[in-house]
């Protein structure tokens, strides 16, 4: 039976609590419709008897036994750490959901746990390719990736150029001498290869593989050097007796014989009109085909045999190397060397001028030196050097790309291709069983031929073809280009 107090208060209380506790509600001054949870106050209980209750419908924790002080051990993150975490979160979102998701302007300021994973303004399906361009500093395109979002602007790195490791042609060259100081192979601008074999000079046409015997010097003489003119129609031959012979390569006819050297002429070099010859007599002679005298100039500076000669690309300077370990640079208007470079510690036979940069000269030393050195002939400073680990026999610069090739002796007898100015190795080619003493380049600049004492000539495809510039299109009469009236 309900107690009178319970019936009066309108509360349904358990039977056991009808006489134990009593609740008192204060009268509210505001109408019930506008009451808020805070309007109910002063819930108090009347003093309970000494007998405690055995059950209750609420659980009130004991604050005295709670370890509330442990929450104070959590340190607030520093602004620097919070900034780094924010940057990492934006970058991660950008990688996963695209660059627009990581943009601070595209995301609401109050983005919290309940925020959607995609922007409300974005559709789930995309029906067109979006334009490229990073919308935030955390866009993937800045870091070299743009997977699936903007592939048009991403350029993959170029793979390294592959150079064939084997020669595409091998020719027998019997009686090809194994002498470091001779220069017995040259390739003309008309695609004809000249080779000195013993007392004879042979011509091999790269166009039709036809072999022609140009001359035979006889049993008491020998071929020490060959060199084509720039036009490729005449060839000069240095002999063991010190003479220089000029031959017409098309008619196989001797044009002239010039003397002046006391002993063998081991190196020759043509510019537009002057032929320079170096000899074991330590002298360099300058010959002019237009005058009747044997030579027009004599350059004295080396203390031993001259074994390397090269004219610069503009025909203004002549570089000479000798067995005295010296590299000399001569001006065409002076009888004295303008530069005397003595850093090499062995004979300097390998010499080459860069066709891509004026006043850039490269030289290589013999067995005791093994270094390739780069020079600025304007001030005589050494720009760089690299130790190849073996005798440097020849050097040639590519006219198609900024690379050069070197041939070497003991112990690998290798051919090496270098990238300039990084001096990174592009390729290392092997095949000769003896030191690679002779080197020449084809007219198109793609193929080199190497010769060695193993009596073989090997042809290698080393350099790429020259890129032809795109023709300039005339946009009409009012174009900014030059027009011809008549």
UniProtKB/Swiss-Prot annotation:
InterPro entries: Cdc20/Fizzy, WD40/YVTN_repeat-like_dom_sf, WD40_CDC20-Fz, WD40_repeat_CS, WD40_repeat_dom_sf, WD40_rpt. Disulfide bonds: none annotated. WD repeats lie at residues 177-214, 218-257, 260-297, 301-340, 343-385, 387-428, 431-470. The keyword DNA damage does not apply. Keywords: Cell cycle, Cell division, Mitosis, Repeat, WD repeat. Residues 41-53 have a biased composition (Low complexity). A motif (PEST motif) lies at residues 24-36. Pfam families: WD40_CDC20-Fz (PF24807). Mostly expressed in shoot apices and, to a lower extent, in roots, especially in root tips, and in hypocotyls. Expressed in nodulation-competent root zone but not in the nodules. A motif (CSM motif) lies at residues 87-98. GO terms for cellular component: anaphase-promoting complex. GO terms for biological process: anaphase-promoting complex-dependent catabolic process; cell division; positive regulation of anaphase-promoting complex-dependent catabolic process; protein ubiquitination. The keyword Cell division applies. Induction: Expression restricted to late G2-phase and M-phase during the cell cycle. Residues 27-57 are annotated as: Disordered. A motif (C-box) lies at residues 57-63. This is B-type cell cycle switch protein ccs52B. It comes from Medicago truncatula.
């Amino acid at each position: 039976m309900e107690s009178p107090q319970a019936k009066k208060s309108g509360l349904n209380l358990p039977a056991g609590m009808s006489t134990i506790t009593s609740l008192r509600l204060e009268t509210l001054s505001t109408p019930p419709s506008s009451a808020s949870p805070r309007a109910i106050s002063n819930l108090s209980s009347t003093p309970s008897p000494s007998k405690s209750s055995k059950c209750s419908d609420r659980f009130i924790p004991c604050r005295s036994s709670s370890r509330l002080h442990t929450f104070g051990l959590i340190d607030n993150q520093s602004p620097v750490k919070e900034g780094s975490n924010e940057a990492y979160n934006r970058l991660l979102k950008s990688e996963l959901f695209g660059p627009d998701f990581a943009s601070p302007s595209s995301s609401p300021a109050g983005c919290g746990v309940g925020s959607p994973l995609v922007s409300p303004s974005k559709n789930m399906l995309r029906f067109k390719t979006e334009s490229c361009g990073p919308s935030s500093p955390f866009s993937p395109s800045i870091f070299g990736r743009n997977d699936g979002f903007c592939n048009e602007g991403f350029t993959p790195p170029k793979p390294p150029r592959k150079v064939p490791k084997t020669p595409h042609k091998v020719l027998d060259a019997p009686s090809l001498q194994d002498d470091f100081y001779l220069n017995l192979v040259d390739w003309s601008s008309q695609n004809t290869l000249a080779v000195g074999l013993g007392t004879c000079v042979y011509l091999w046409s790269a166009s039709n593989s036809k072999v022609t015997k140009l001359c035979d010097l006889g049993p008491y003489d020998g071929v020490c050097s060959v060199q084509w003119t720039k036009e490729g129609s005449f060839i000069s031959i240095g002999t063991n007796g010190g003479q220089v012979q000029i031959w017409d390569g098309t008619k196989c006819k001797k044009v002239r014989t010039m003397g002046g050297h006391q002993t063998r002429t081991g190196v020759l070099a043509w510019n537009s009109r002057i032929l320079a010859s170096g000899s074991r007599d330590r002298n360099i002679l300058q010959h002019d085909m237009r005058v009747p005298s044997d030579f027009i100039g004599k350059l004295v500076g080396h203390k031993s045999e001259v074994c390397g000669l090269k004219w610069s690309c503009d025909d203004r300077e002549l570089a000479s190397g000798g067995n005295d370990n010296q590299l000399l640079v001569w001006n065409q208007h002076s009888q004295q060397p303008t530069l005397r470079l003595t850093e090499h510690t062995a004979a300097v036979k390998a010499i080459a001028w860069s066709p891509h940069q004026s006043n850039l000269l490269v030289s290589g030393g013999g067995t005791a030196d093994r270094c390739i050195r780069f020079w600025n002939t304007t001030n005589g400073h050494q720009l760089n050097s690299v130790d190849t680990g073996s005798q440097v026999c020849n050097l040639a610069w590519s006219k198609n790309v900024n690379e050069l090739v070197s041939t070497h002796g003991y112990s690998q007898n290798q051919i090496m291709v270098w990238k300039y100015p990084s001096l990174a190795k592009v390729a290392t080619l092997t095949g000769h069983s003896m030191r690679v003493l002779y080197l020449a380049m084809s007219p198109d600049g793609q193929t080199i031929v190497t010769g060695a004492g193993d009596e073989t000539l090997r042809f290698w495809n080393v350099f790429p073809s020259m890129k032809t510039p795109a023709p300039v299109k005339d946009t009409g009469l009012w174009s900014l280009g030059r027009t011809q009236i008549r």
